[in-house]
């Protein structure tokens, strides 16, 4: 199935292909470092999508950060941005 939306973004000096597509399994997002690609499930509710976007962006920016730190940081940033009125 082709991605529903694809973007080219630059994070930490690298270009990434950011794709919204149907994902199988339980993960809402994947960051493929060797392919410079991020895949995000295309059917997520807005707040969850924002958090997954932030989560995967943090993986791209800080690859040595622990999964727990990435998860906590993404959740905290999503709460702040949502409170400030940022929406998709």
Where are these regions (language model features)?
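Active-site scaffold of zinc-dependent metalloenzymes
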Residues: 2-47, 62-63, 67-81
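Active-site recognition of the HExxH zinc-binding catalytic motif
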Residues: 51-60
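Short, charged, intrinsically disordered terminal tails
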Residues: 84-88
